[in-house]
């Protein structure tokens, strides 16, 4: 199984958009994404490198599995 590593914020935003999320607003240097059927918004900081723990928390919030994440990452 592949290991999740830190990635640039723009890549994580593209992954969320490919998963059906829409950016509804920005708050400071954070982008807020929502999707119908997902209870909580996904918040992505606009940093050069997003740490692994934030990526994992956002994947859990979005309901995206590791396999889906790597599939979407390969398309970005």
Please describe what each predicted stretch is.
Residues 3, 40, 69:
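Glycine-rich, flexible loop/turn motifs
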Residues 51-76:
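C-terminal structural segments of small proteins and small subunits
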